[in-house]
């Protein structure tokens, strides 16, 4: 039976991940002086992910319109990651980078992050994988997690404020290349 297009879905994985991220952020924000706009950006990023995957959008995407599924992908890979990263203070981002070590430093280099973004988008949208993901909830969750991850990796060089941060024109070119090629 096909559900009502206005019915809400319940995807516990992304609700739980959103809750864990919110609690971790709240703890870190309590120790630092985080401006309200960073808190709002982080909350909006979590709301986009949880809302895209636990609302009528999910029902419509899964049972009615492929276009809505593509909108979900854009919400969780293109819109939520920059909001989540902007929500982090420079000190929080530096702590994450330190925790990630060399591997994190490597994958967030623009010359590595851009190919990861492109290969990720293309791989997820290969017809066989895409069709399988639309029929298998576990694969669909894996697809959504991958989109969030590649989104965070792609957006890190744009949002980063490290000593080796990209200049504004290079950030614009990087974003242009990423969106034109994907």
Residue spans for each PLM region:
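Alpha-helical membrane segments of multi-pass proteins
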Residues: 1-182
């Amino acid at each position: 039976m096909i559900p009502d297009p206005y019915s809400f879905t319940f995807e516990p994985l992304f609700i739980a991940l959103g809750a864990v991220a919110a609690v971790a952020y709240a703890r870190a924000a309590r120790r630092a002086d985080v401006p309200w706009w960073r808190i709002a950006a982080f909350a909006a990023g979590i709301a986009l992910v949880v809302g895209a995957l636990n609302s009528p959008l999910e029902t419509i995407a899964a049972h009615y319109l492929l276009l809505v599924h593509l909108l979900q992908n854009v919400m969780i890979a293109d819109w939520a990651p920059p909001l989540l990263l902007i929500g982090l203070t420079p000190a929080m981002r530096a702590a994450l980078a330190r925790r990630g070590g060399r591997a994190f430093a490597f994958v967030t280099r623009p010359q590595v992050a851009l190919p990861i973004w492109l290969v990720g988008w293309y791989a997820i949208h290969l017809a066989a994988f895409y069709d399988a993901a639309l029929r298998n909830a576990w694969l669909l969750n894996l697809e959504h997690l991958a989109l969030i991850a590649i989104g965070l990796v792609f957006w890190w060089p744009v949002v980063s404020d490290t000593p080796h941060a990209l200049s504004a024109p290079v950030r614009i070119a990087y974003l242009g290349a990423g969106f034109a090629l994907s």
